[in-house]
Amino acid sequence: MERQVLLSEPEEAAALYRVLSRQPALSAACLGPDVTTQYGGRYRTVHTEWTQRDLERMENIRFCRQYLVFHDEDSVVFAGPAGSSVETRGELLSRESPSGTLKAVLRKAGGTGPGEEKQFLEVWEKNRKLKSFNLSALEKHGPVYEDDCFGCLSWSHSETHLLYVAEKKRPKAESFFQTKALDVSAGEDETARPKKPDQAVKGDQFVFYEDWGESMVSKSTPVLCVLDVESGNISVLEGVPENVSPGQAFWAPGDTGVVFVGWWHEPFRLGIRFCTNRRSALYYVDLTGGKYELLSDDSLAISSPRLSPDQCRIVYLRYPSLVPHHQCSQLCLYDWYTKVTSVVVDIVPRQLGENFSGIYCSLLPLGCWSADSQRVVFDSAQRSRQDLFVVDTQTGSVTSLTAGGSGGSWKLLTIDQDLMVAQFSTPSLPPSLKVGFLPPAGKEQSVSWVSLEEAEPIPDIHWGIRVLQPPPEQENAQYAGLDFEAILMQPGSPSDKTQVPMVVMPHGGPHSSFVTAWMLFPAMLCKMGFAVLLVNYRGSTGFGQDSILSLPGNVGQQDVKDVQFAVEQVLREERFDTGRVALMGGSHGGFLSCHLIGQYPETYGACVARNPVTNIASMMGSTDIPDCAKSCRCVVEAGFPYSNDCLPDLSVWADMLDKSPIKYIPQVKTPLLLMLGQEDRRVPFKQGIEYYRALKARSVPVRLLLYPKSTHALSEVEVESDSFMNAVLWLRTHLGT
């Protein structure tokens, strides 16, 4: 029988990519104030922000769309769009005031060259721009932080001041041999004289400023800034401890001061993106006295503090250990008036049956409190799904708001006055926008969801979750009895499954997971005729803290064997074409892919690795996360304690090398396509070069794509589209059509 045709020409794959890549992604939502019509009806405006790939402009465009939700206090009566989508150019941050009458917008404008781009902070009222402040011209600070790690844009409760985070203004520096410009503005009878120099520091123009690593380049020393909307005066807050970098700030009750998270930056900064384990604590700075107060334990890591509507309590995520880089978190509650901190939801070592498996989100939504300031809503991975949960802060009881659904995944965008805005998707259904009211306590499982924007399902994609139990010889002695899962996607109704090729995709991290949500690359491959196996090996988030802790010290072994076990079992059960199995992985998924073609060379006919770790030992001195991180297992993931003030001994270096894919180079024969970002700070591209040269020396088919301005994620539109097409052609060449 003839093999299943994957594609006849590259143009077909490009056409398919063009169609599916048009699916927009939700990035944010906020709710306007409650409005009562002259006829007694009540409605709220839902303002949503989306992103979409534009292949003509080769960029991600941002656009907004508004919807109206008519309601009767506890249920949606009618909901629908209010006008068409509008592209928003230059918007970096936006936030409505507490009353909803004002809106602040941080906007960039100007050229693209160095020093040409400017930042403006605008204040809008109804249909007009009320104020516009040229932050760049005022020179009170450097660029404003727009990221979700440090960045914030917060209205005071009085709506008279705006709080944000920006880079600290650096002193001017000049050469010891700088020639002074002459002052030619003097009168004709005066001799030209040197201009009065600025207070520039001689010899400091090449001083090294540490930044916060991958995707945080040039962000080094954040400061808290307050803008007086009426006067336009900007103040840089004093009182922040010298040893921490502030971020995620908001106004304290009564506008008496500012609450913020402070991250330790001594003795040096480590990469912070995707690393929730960075030592940090909750602080309060009084605006009158300029003194700070520590509000939490300062030996752990915290994230996303959120003030309750009654301004009495703050919830935040707390991580019980500074290793590994991401893990199960506690939900903590700080009472503003009693100064008492309590743990509302604790770490879950292991999921029991269908019970809650813990909190794994890295950030709580900005809007997460119920109207009565008693309950908190959030989303979290639960095994291979992502669900919405509500927790009662008084009793600690956790209830799923989306259990028993169709098996897809949910993301909470915001909740305000008990009206929730959420996103829902599946591997075959792009994101849909939904709203629903949070039911009263005790009835939370009865949410009635209404669609504001319903996506069309992609036909001929079937998917399901496979539960996998490692064989006895692969059990972890310290954490025995752990299982793991994989999401299997396959083309609909093939004439003969034995002719269907399979692409295996282990996720990055290693402490992250695949969930049953929309993913462009797997959907594309499935539409082209591939089965796609997405493996959540032991160590993935969503399966309990024990699963996460089972992996450090066992990378390159436990995770590799889990993926291989999943592949063999699925091939055996589904009877896919065993002669056409390929690997595709990025970051730690690339690390595993390179391991698999070395440890199991007979299984795989082709491999695509994106920014893979190939030699843990050689990467330790160049990555932004030498301790343990999203894509490299330098020390902690290799099974050793990390310390800022010491170097590993020879045995540790040897063991890191022993756990690396490059150890298995002599066995590799699978054709490999490497894709590297030249600006990758997490896994420096030299890792891929090292592996590439080792394969070239042994005449193994290998091709290298080096993207000059791309970072670790390879997510720029031009890079992402090019890398996918090259991956497809690589699979076509080495697996056959």
Swiss-Prot record:
Keywords: Acetylation, Cytoplasm, Hydrolase, Phosphoprotein. It catalyses: Cleavage of an N-acetyl or N-formyl amino acid from the N-terminus of a polypeptide. InterPro entries: 6-blade_b-propeller_TolB-like, AARE_N, AB_hydrolase_fold, Pept_S9_AS, Peptidase_S9_cat. It comes from the Eukaryota. It is found in: Cytoplasm. Its EC number is 3.4.19.1. One of its GO terms (biological process) is proteolysis. The modification N-acetylmethionine is found at residue 1. It is an enzyme of class 3 (hydrolase). Pfam families: APEH_N, Peptidase_S9. The active site is at residues 587, 680, 712. This is Acylamino-acid-releasing enzyme. The gene is APEH.
